[in-house]
Amino acid sequence: MKAIKVNAGRTAAVQPARMPKLRDGYLLCKVHCVALNPADWKYLDFIGVQGVTLGADLSGVVEEIDPSCGAHFEKGDRIAAFVHGGNVSQPDDGAFAEYCLVKADLALKVPDAMSDEDAATLGVAVATCGQALYQGLELPLPGGAPYDGFLLVYGGSTSTGTLAIQYARLSGCKVIATASPHNWPLLKELGVEETFDYKDPDCAKKVRGIPICKAGYLTDGALIRAFTSDSLVLALDCIAEGDSAKICEDSISESKGGTICYLFQAKHSRADIVDKRVFAYTVFGEAFDKFGQSWPARAEDFARGKEFAALASQMLSDGQLRPHPVRLGKDGLEGVLDGLQQLRERKVSGAKLVYRVVETP
């Protein structure tokens, strides 16, 4: 089979690869489509351990099932999944391949009406939303007692952002979001209360409800506070770079404080704000090394991830979740390499790059 492997010098190429060997609790998936995430190129450029397979998001069909998986899946079932690409402990686990192992308890069942291309956008975003919204920010699960308050989603037009907006609204939140103005119509379709341009120097104060003086300039992030009348206590930062942490911090109520959940490492300066960091790879419940740190196995994260995957599969079947918009690339796995460069150059906004593996030359 073929896969995208990391070579010496932190480069990557499509090359022959061994078929993954089935492990306890895993399915063997024939990969139909893969989707790209910023973590893919960042891992390659900043760590890039030779010999590992890249990629985290996929859709495909079940080819083989480990007996320990139970009766949840059958051969031929369509699935979407988040897999641990760039994993030195299991170097063949990446999504950018013709075949890939998928942890059965975390796999999503794909409805008949959903395309493989749309399904490929779901895996990472579903797992991340589960950890960020329901473990980190402790929102009630959809169907429970609703949360009666605002949630800020910074980076609302990312794949995680659009799904977080939908989940949060189903949990009762009044969602506000930051995004580039050209992506505002998408967020409005998803039901956000208001959108804010993260490049606006007054962004956070407009959210919190601070009067905006037309003469002179206010601090960065100053717009969000106005809309919430200084009541915002929960924020999800899907970007965690540039000014995102500062804008989220400035948006949080000065009278109440609050909690910010970051998808990557970030810092704030306010003592009345609690940090929560999400690192979605812990959802597998397995120890690993990544980005210069050793991460122990987290049984609780796996248990919660299993519960959330089952809920997500049901919600997808019921038509409650809308996949992120797709930008379909060409040339299969070879095209993925070009897609990684597009992500490096910040050329993709409001859509997810997806590639059909069968189109690999």
From Swiss-Prot:
So, what pathway does this thing act in? Secondary metabolite biosynthesis
Which SMART domains does the record match to this protein?
PKS_ER (SM00829)
Locate the residues binding substrate.
V124, A125, V126, A127, T128, C129, G130, Q131, A280, Y281, T282, V283, F284
Keywords (alphabetical) are:
NADP, Nucleotide-binding, Oxidoreductase
Principal EC category: oxidoreductase
Positions bound to NADP(+): 39-42, 157-160, 180-183, 198, 260-261, 348-349
Domain of life (superkingdom): Eukaryota
Q: What is its EC number?
A: 1.-.-.-
> Is Methyltransferase one of the keywords?
no
Transmembrane stretches in the record are none
Q: Which GO terms describe its molecular function?
A: nucleotide binding; oxidoreductase activity, acting on NAD(P)H
Keyword Oxidoreductase applies: yes
Its job: Oxidoreductase; part of the hps1-dma1 gene cluster that probably mediates the biosynthesis a derivative of cyclopiazonic acid (CPA). The hybrid polyketide synthase-nonribosomal peptide synthetase (PKS-NRPS) nps1 might incorporates acetyl-CoA, malonyl-CoA, and tryptophan (Trp) and utilizes a C-terminal redox-incompetent reductase domain to make and release the tryptophan tetramic acid, cyclo-acetoacetyl-L-tryptophan (c-AATrp), as the first intermediate in the pathway.
Q: Oligomeric state and partners?
A: Monomer.
Q: Which family does it belong to?
A: Belongs to the zinc-containing alcohol dehydrogenase family.
Q: What is this protein called?
A: Hps1-dma1 cluster oxidoreductase toxD
